[in-house]
A protein has these predicted regions:
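Cell-envelope/extracellular polymer assembly enzymes that use nucleotide-activated donors
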Residues: 17-294
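Secretory targeting and sorting signals
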Residues: 1-21
């Protein structure tokens, strides 16, 4: 993708298309995944796109993560170490930025920045022995290979647990297909006449409000909106951005046109994606079985 500021603008296209942690999981979704069938999830754009059907929901990811921690606890017990898995966090809908800003409240509070409350939670403090065996060398290459005469898994008990749960439910080919569709449909959608017209209408609306931008991606490239504290100017710009999207119907037009592209792309890879979906269901079922055993 051609971007002026790749790290920032990647939030648009890569929301919902890159793997969380590892593509070996067979999941094309990113950090902003669908939560459940909640009204919040239904109201988003990313999670209503056709390709979202081939991703885990946040609730499913939470089950998988909880199961991995349960397996890690069993592994830790073999080293006579007590590990208490973190309590599961109820999935919360996160900002949907595939098409840039779309939430008036977030724009008014944080401008073009992410809501600080959506930052990853810090892991609980663990004592040195527990931490060394739980994470192994993936966190600290100097960690000893053994603990009290027993070999520590190279990536620790948690890494081993993740590997054990993942190995039977990996579909990298399907995950690659889903990720490719999500990326390509986004890029191609911006070239469609309907979306281009939407950009022009949005740009004209922004011009009336005193802001000169050709596309909704442009404000994210502004240095002043990426560094330092959020200013009133940034909040005002972000508010106008969202307001103009609503007035011109850009969000719905963009979503509709990209959905058409994805539907056609999915039809060409139907078998691959069906297998990916089956693998997802099997892995979630396995995770829930682990949790049921306690």
């Amino acid at each position: 993708m051609k971007r002026l500021v790749p790290a920032m603008l990647a939030m648009f296209a890569l929301v919902g298309c890159t793997a969380q942690g590892s593509q070996d999981d067979g999941d094309p979704a990113g950090s902003n995944r669908p939560t459940t069938d909640s009204e919040a999830a239904k109201g988003s754009y990313t999670y209503r796109l056709p390709i979202a059907a081939y991703s885990y929901t946040d609730a499913e990811y939470a089950s998988i993560a909880a199961a991995e921690h349960m397996l890690a606890r069993t592994c830790m017990a073999r080293f006579s170490l007590t590990y208490q898995p973190p309590p599961p966090n109820p999935p919360q809908p996160s900002a949907d930025r595939r098409y840039g800003l779309s939430d008036e409240k977030s724009a008014a509070l944080f401008g073009y920045r992410m809501d600080p409350s959506e930052a990853p939670k810090q892991p609980p403090q663990l004592d040195a022995d527990v931490r060394a065996v739980l994470y192994g060398k993936r966190e600290d290459a100097s960690v000893p290979a053994e603990y009290q005469g027993q070999k520590v898994p190279e990536n620790g008990c948690l890494g081993q647990a993740q590997s054990d749960l993942r190995k039977d439910y990996s579909d990298p080919e399907g995950a690659e297909a889903a990720s490719r569709i999500s990326s390509q449909s986004y890029e191609q959608s911006m070239q469609l006449p309907e979306v281009q017209a939407g950009f022009r209408n949005w740009s004209a609306c922004m011009q009336k409000n005193g802001y000169t931008y050709a596309s909704p991606r442009d404000p994210f490239a502004a240095q002043e909106f990426r560094e330092g504290p959020v200013t009133e100017r940034e909040k005002a710009t972000a508010g106008a951005d969202v307001s103009c999207k609503r007035r011109t119907g850009l969000l719905d037009v963009w979503f509709t046109e990209e959905s058409k592209l994805q539907t056609a792309m999915i039809a060409k890879d139907r078998q691959l994606l069906q297998k990916l979906q089956d693998v997802h269901r099997q892995k979630v079922a396995a995770a829930k079985a682990i949790l049921a055993k306690g």
